[in-house]
Amino acid sequence: KLTFSCDVEKKDEVVQLFKDVKSKWGEIDFVVHAVAFSDKSELSGEYLNTTRENFLRSMLISCFSFTEVSKEASKIMKEEGSLLTLTYESTKAIPNYNVMGVCKSALEASVKYLARDLGGKKIRVNAISAGPIKTLAASAIGDAKFLYKWNEDHSFLKRNVDIHDVGNSALYLISNLSACVTC
């Protein structure tokens, strides 16, 4: 069995996931966290209209899940292992991103604290903030086409990042080539 399911909203499933991984493979070298969620209807309009329920659920799935996954993964991670997550533009208020911008800001802060906490175990913690990428998740953001075009026009390389660019960066960050790179 090469795949396991895990609902990151349920702590017991996160704990069980890493028990299952440990029983299958023993130790692990890395984890890539690529999890995010928000109610699509709350991404457009004003952030001010974010509901408490969506805020809490979005924060749990998009941010806290990385902390919980890191905690459990670090118990079975080899020395010089790597924890990696994906983020996007948390320093500016992006139209039609709303609560996800807040979640990504919290996620990026979490990366720093996890890097500090796990550095003594020689576990690296990093995040890739690649910019807007054409994915199914990104299609939920209103005006995504405008965002891609604006980014392409204003990037130094005059092009958008694609999934292959992100994959190459991820390979570097989870490999020993980045042995001294954390946060």
Regions found by a protein language model. Give the residues of each.
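Conserved mid-core segment of classical short-chain dehydrogenase/reductases
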Residues: L2-C6, K10-V15, K19-G26, H33-L56, ...
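Structural signature of beta-strand start/N-cap positions in the alpha/beta core
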Residues: E27, S82, R124-N126, A179
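Catalytic loop of short-chain dehydrogenase/reductase
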Residues: A36-K71, K75, E79-G120, P132-K134
